[in-house]
Each structure stands twice: as C-alpha cells, then as structure tokens.
C-alpha cells in the first residue's frame, strides 16, 4: 500500500516559503507551503477523519510530509494491524529531527500529532491513522516566541541528521510509542552521551524553570561524573577547563555550574528557592548553551572509562 504521513512542526517558522519542501531524508520533506499537501488535505477522506480545523491548521504551518509504499502490506486487514504502530514510528522519527534543530540553536519546536494515510490506487479510498506524543519543548528561557530558522540553519540540521534505524521501532515498543529505557541501564550498554541527551530532552520538555535546571544538571553528571565525592565541584571544574578559552570565560563557566547546583540542591530537597526568576533564566540558558556545545562536539573522552577520564581532566587542568 502507498502512504503519506503528515505532522506539524509547532512553533517553527522558515525564512522562505518552500512549496515543494526541502528533503530531510529520502521520501521526507519539510515545507511551509500548502501546495505540497493540498491534494491530500482537500479530500473527503481528510474532512471525515482529520477534520477541517486540523486540516486548515496544517496548511498554515511548517510541517513534514513523508511519501512511500509499504511493500509488505497489500490490504486493509494487514494495514489495520500495524497502522497506528507505523504512525508512531514516523512521528518519533520527526521528533528525532527536532533534536537536531536544537543542536543548531535553542528553540521551542515540537511535534504532537501525526497522521498516516494509507491507500492503494486512489487516495479517497484510503484509511487514516493517528498517533500523538506529549513532549512540548520550550526555550531554555521559556520565552513564548516562534523559532525562525534560516535556510543555512535548516541545511545544517538536515546535513547532520541521521534517521533512526528501523530496528528502533518494533512491536515491543509499539513503533516507538513506549520509550526504551535501555539507554539508562548499565547491563544494556548505557553510554554517557545518550544519557546526557535523554536528560537534555527532559529539560527541554519541562515547563517549570527549576525543573529544567535539575535536568540540565543531570545531563552534565552523565558526561562528567566519575565518582561520588565532590560531584558538583568536579563538574564545574571540568566544564570550565574543557570549554573555557580565557581566564574570564573559565571563571564564568565554573560559577554558572556552581550556581546551578545550588538551585538544584534546593529543588530536589523540596526547599523554597532562594532565587530571583531572572537568575533562574540566566542559569537555564547558560546550561543549555553548555550542553549544546558538549553534545555537538561529542568529545572522545566521553566514551572513556572513569580512570581514563580522570587522567584526561587532570592533564587538562595542569596543561
């Protein structure tokens, strides 16, 4: 059966109109023009299943659409067994792309609903499936503006995007509906960088600033912790010497992380925060920038064992 998948990229604005769309990966395009999908949305199938309100909102948004064919599915009985599951797999793939957009810059782009239309010869004779996610990503500052991406910024995200393998989606996780916890388990080969990404995503989906900071701190611990003593001091020191280029920048980074951990300590122990809202915003934004730089660079030291990491940072400290 042939298919078309559509999902809105909420809060995303492109600097130019892209009617046909720009290819993200084979079969998938990002667009902000209605011409690409008008043949889909202006049909009775869409009106009766998706509804006119949702249809019109997609036309006026930035969205992703994916065209292809399920070579292993030939009739509605087969499609009904896996339709929702495959809708989730497409939706998770686009959510994965939003993480690449974050690597370009801080933003509040997210996906919620995805629609899959499956058909044989004629679209009107097809069937509709829907999947929904709950992660609403926000700016590190929690500002409420749209995120505008230039052509060069979009190109950077697309060039660096590596689609998830089909092996990531199976019956056990229902096409990605149920997140996999293996990345957190040591006996499943958990890796520092993947855990850091996990908590960074948690920070981006937090709507309360102190919770963002807690998750950002967890992400830093995933990358830098090698023991249980003086954790926050070691992390502040290691962030400073790894990213700082001058005495002043190293000092500022050290103070940023120390301040973040003061907020984190009060938050996780249920205390009232002794902070002004503007201070929380500055720290949250600073941590977001730090993690973006660390994750994008993906230094080889983060794949080393604890002793090798300790030796690396000791050498860096006294170099």
Task: Report the location of each language-model feature.
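Histidine-centered, metal-coordinating catalytic motifs and their short helical/loop contexts
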Residues: 251-279
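Glycine- and acidic
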Residues: 198-204, 244-247, 272-277
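Short runs of predominantly hydrophobic/aromatic residues within well-ordered alpha helices
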Residues: 193-196, 212-216, 220, 232, ...
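Charged, non-catalytic interaction/linker regions at domain boundaries
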Residues: 1-211, 280-282, 288-289, 294-318
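Charged/polar positions within long, soluble alpha-helices
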Residues: 228, 265-273, 295-303
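Short alpha-helical scaffolding segments that buttress acidic/His motifs in well-ordered protein cores
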Residues: 196, 200, 217-220, 239, ...
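Composition- and surface-driven signal marking solvent-exposed, interaction-prone regions
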Residues: 216, 232-237, 273, 277-284
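Flexible secondary-structure boundary motifs
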Residues: 214-251
């Amino acid at each position: 059966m042939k298919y078309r998948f559509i999902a809105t990229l909420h809060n995303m604005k492109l600097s130019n109109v892209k009617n046909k769309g720009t290819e993200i990966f084979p079969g998938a395009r990002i667009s902000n023009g209605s011409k690409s999908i008008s043949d889909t949305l202006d049909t009775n199938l869409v009106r009766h299943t998706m509804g006119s309100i949702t249809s019109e909102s997609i036309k006026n948004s930035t969205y992703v659409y994916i065209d292809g064919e399920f070579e292993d599915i030939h009739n509605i009985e087969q499609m009904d067994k896996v339709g929702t599951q495959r809708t989730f797999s497409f939706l998770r793939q686009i959510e994965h792309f939003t993480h690449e957009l974050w690597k370009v810059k801080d933003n509040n782009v997210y996906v919620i609903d995805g629609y899959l239309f499956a058909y044989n010869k004629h679209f009107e004779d097809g069937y509709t499936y829907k999947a929904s996610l709950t992660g609403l990503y926000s700016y590190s500052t929690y500002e409420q503006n749209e995120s505008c991406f230039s052509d060069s910024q979009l190109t950077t995200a697309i060039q660096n995007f590596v689609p998830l393998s089909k092996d990531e989606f199976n019956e056990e996780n229902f096409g990605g509906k149920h997140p996999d916890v293996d990345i957190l388990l040591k006996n499943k080969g958990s890796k520092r960088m993947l855990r850091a990404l996990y908590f960074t995503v948690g920070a981006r989906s937090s709507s309360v600033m102190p919770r963002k900071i807690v998750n950002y701190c967890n992400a830093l611990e995933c990358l830098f912790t090698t023991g249980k003593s003086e954790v926050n001091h070691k992390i502040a020191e290691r962030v400073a010497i790894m990213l700082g280029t001058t005495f002043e920048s190293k000092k500022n980074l050290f103070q940023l992380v120390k301040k973040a951990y003061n907020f984190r300590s009060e938050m996780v122990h249920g205390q009232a925060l002794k902070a002004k809202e503007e201070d929380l915003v500055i720290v949250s934004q600073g941590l977001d920038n730090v993690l973006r730089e660390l994750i994008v660079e993906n230094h080889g030291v983060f794949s080393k064992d604890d002793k090798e990491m300790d030796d690396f940072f000791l050498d860096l400290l006294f170099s």
